Amino acid sequence: MLGATPAAAGVAEHVTEPVAYDAILLAGFGGPEGQDDVIPFLRNVTRGRGILDERLEEVAQHYRHFGGVSPINDQNRALKAALEAELASRGIDLPVLWGNRNWDPYLADALTEADQRGFTKLIAVATSAYSSYSSCRQYREDFARALRETGLEGRIQIDKVRQFFDHPGFVEPFIEGVKNAVEELRERAPEIHPATGVRILFSTHSIPSTDAGKSGPSGRPDSGEPWGEGGAYAAQHLAVAEIVSHEATGGTIGWDLVYQSRSGPPSMPWLEPDINDRIAELPELGVKAIIIVPLGFVSDHMEVLWDLDTEAMESSEENGLLAVRVPTPGTHAKYVKGLVDLVLERRDGLPVAQRPSLTTLGPWYDVCRPGCCENVRLGFKPAVAGLTP
């Protein structure tokens, strides 16, 4: 397996032998930090697709609305500091390096720093919880590309923590947020009965339907049965939404999984329904208020600020709905602790039976399965921390 440690280079789904990692690689998406950065950043995001700058400028307006600055970099700086503080509080000597896929500091910068400091074994934590090409395999491909670009293949090995969609550290902040949102609605509109007048909308990034169908391995880990519509990506979100709904409301408030931030030509099918379309349908069902849960996101980055806090809130107002948006995990203490626990899980080779997961789909694989999360348009490229292809 390209670029992985020997412990992760076998065919086992989970690694249960200790690995002496030298550092943590916090792998982010990246974002512009000024107006002049916006178009170059979007060129990086869309590299290889042949998208003209005129089309990129349409998306750029979302960033320009906020001064050309994406909040994601400051959020990752805060997460890096929170991880370092959590590690220090436990007496764990693991430096945290930070590198992005699409903007400074790049993954190649982090690998160069690792080499300069004599680090040879890195455990990566990507800022994405679910299984799909863009949220898992593309990170692994970018690790491989950065190793090639820096000439560090064979000198630095990179493993990656499992997808943590159903880890308590990721899920519990959402449960807490929904509970708080229900209370907020009770205070703001006591006349609205939660069971009949409130709807929870769990929102995540839409992806092409063909890519969704290729997300995850070929069958469900809990039953071996084929995935339904939307593949592992949709199934993971549905499973987590069910847990959050049950734990936060006892299942008394209805909910939907909705999608946002789609791009690409209208002729290409993407996962639906769009959150704004669903919002427009709710008044006819007697819904008076909604709770928006950004279930697919780890921090309040541009897709949350624009697509939810701007567009979805405008849709809610246009349709006469009271709306509350739940926070993302961000630097919530449970989330930060959970990420460190995931690192230690791999460092110590924790037995699978001792690994926490809140759905029957987990704990997810340490080593990605062959053919996992194919990009149908681009095909397979070299990737670390998973089996070929």
UniProtKB/Swiss-Prot annotation:
Record keywords, A-Z: Cytoplasm, Heme biosynthesis, Iron, Lyase, Metal-binding, Porphyrin biosynthesis
The protein, known as: Coproporphyrin III ferrochelatase
Binding site for Fe-coproporphyrin III: S70, Y139
A GO CC term assigned to this protein in UniProt: cytoplasm
GO biological process: heme biosynthetic process
Lineage: superkingdom: Bacteria
Compartment annotation: Cytoplasm
EC number: 4.99.1.9
Catalyzed reactions per annotation: Fe-coproporphyrin III + 2 H(+) = coproporphyrin III + Fe(2+)
Region annotation Disordered: where it falls in the sequence: 207-229
Pathway assignment: Porphyrin-containing compound metabolism; protoheme biosynthesis
Residues that hold Fe(2+) according to the record: H205, E303
Entry function: Involved in coproporphyrin-dependent heme b biosynthesis. Catalyzes the insertion of ferrous iron into coproporphyrin III to form Fe-coproporphyrin III.
Family: Belongs to the ferrochelatase family.
CDD domains (alphabetical): Ferrochelatase_C, Ferrochelatase_N
Chief localization: cytoplasm
Uppermost EC category: lyase
GO molecular function: ferrochelatase activity; metal ion binding
Keyword Iron: yes
UniProt-listed InterPro entries: Ferrochelatase, Ferrochelatase_C, Ferrochelatase_N
